[in-house]
């Protein structure tokens, strides 16, 4: 049986934590930053954990993660 290919788009966006959860970046920190407060931009810079409802889909895209 052939190997399953990893979706490269998902591999570039997610990384696996030590406990097996997926880490992701937050959105809204690319442009139009002047109207956003410093506190909001600082919080957007931190990484987040993929929600449980989406974790199954991410795991399917990255079979060897």
From Swiss-Prot:
Gene that this polypeptide is encoded by: rpmI
Keyword Cell division recorded: no
Record organism: Nitratidesulfovibrio vulgaris (strain ATCC 29579 / DSM 644 / CCUG 34227 / NCIMB 8303 / VKM B-1760 / Hildenborough) (Desulfovibrio vulgaris)
Key word Ribonucleoprotein present: yes
HAMAP family from the UniProt entry: Ribosomal_bL35
GO biological process, one term: translation
Pfam families from the UniProt entry: Ribosomal_L35p
A cellular-component GO term for this protein: cytosolic large ribosomal subunit
Family: Belongs to the bacterial ribosomal protein bL35 family.
Record key words, sorted: Ribonucleoprotein, Ribosomal protein
NCBIfam families per record: rpmI_bact
A GO molecular-function annotation: structural constituent of ribosome
Regions that span the bilayer: none
Name of the protein: Large ribosomal subunit protein bL35
Span list, region Disordered: 1-25
Biased composition (Basic residues): 1-11
């Amino acid at each position: 049986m052939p190997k399953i290919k990893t979706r490269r788009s998902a591999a570039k966006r997610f990384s696996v934590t030590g406990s097996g959860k997926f880490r992701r970046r937050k959105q809204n920190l690319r442009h139009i930053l002047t109207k956003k407060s410093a506190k909001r931009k600082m919080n957007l810079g931190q990484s987040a954990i993929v929600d449980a409802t989406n974790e199954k889909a991410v795991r399917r895209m990255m079979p060897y993660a």
